[in-house]
Amino acid sequence: MTRSQKTEVQARFGATAEAYVRSAGHAGGPDLERLVAWGRSTGASRLLDIATGGGHTALAFSAFTPTVVATDLTEPMLLAARAFASGQGMTTIRFLGADVEALPFRDAAFGAVTCRIAAHHFPAVPPALKQVARVLLPGGTFLLQDILGHEDPELAGFILEVEKRRDPSHVRALSQAKWVEHLRTAGFTGLEEAVVTKGRPWEEWTGRMRMTAEARAALDRFVLEAPARCREAFSFTVEEGRIRAFTDRMLLIRAHKSY
Ligand SMILES: C[S@@+](CC[C@H](N)C(=O)[O-])C[C@H]1O[C@@H](n2cnc3c(N)ncnc32)[C@H](O)[C@@H]1O
């Protein structure tokens, strides 16, 4: 029997929680800096970070936000994130188990909500956005970052296969146009968008998900045998037949819940 999407998420991230806490790509970069700059300008006093993973976004926002609540579906991830935040001297973030589709908060409880590099794991985006809109104050800010989906079908199919082979809990990466459509439908306005690139060192990126040697070898073969335009589109670097790195594009969106 195939595991449900959420069970798959818990299995994958439960086994790799420590690696996510240590991941340099999650700990910082121009993407997190942009979210933080947007966040500072909101002046929100209560922030919810959904799908907090290793807790890096929650930690960054706690430097200037009095109340930060961080939620995630995966219990070991929350334990690792809590220990990480405490180790950084930040003991005020409240970590809580919660599915994004059933957030255990009253309506209009937060001035800002963040969701960074996680929505590609959600079974569906509209129910998640409905919850985000519900827990935000009217006029409140939603800061989203996720892997940007490609508009070109061949390139989109190629990178989806790469992602799913590495992590079967990856569902899809939406295009910019699709995100804008979903956000507007959920009642968000005043959208501001940015795209930044993020380097993915191959050994670290594949290693973090603890692939078997066979699955990793098959993934390498899939990439190396793909049409050259696929590798070029994601700036794959290959030296002496070995994949070294590639580049993801990240979509960042600032949106406001309408009054
Ligand atoms: C890559 S990590 C997130 C990284 C983190 N936000 C950061 O800024 O470093 C993805 C996280 O999404 C969580 N997740 C996936 N599906 C979820 C869901 N339906 N509800 C809540 N969390 C979910 C996983 O458990 C995992 O911890």
What are these regions (language model features)?
Residues 1-42, 56-60, 77-80, 87-88, 143-165, ...:
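Conserved class I S-adenosyl-L-methionine
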Residues 54, 190-259:
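Conserved Class I S-adenosyl-L-methionine
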Residues 101-112:
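A short acidic, Gly/Pro-enriched loop at the edge of an enzyme's catalytic core
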Residues 111-124:
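A short SAM/SAH-binding and catalytic strip from SAM-dependent methyltransferases
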Residues 126-141:
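A short glycine-rich, Lys/Arg-flanked "PGG" loop and its adjoining helix->strand segment in the class I
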Residues 172-186:
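Short alpha-helix
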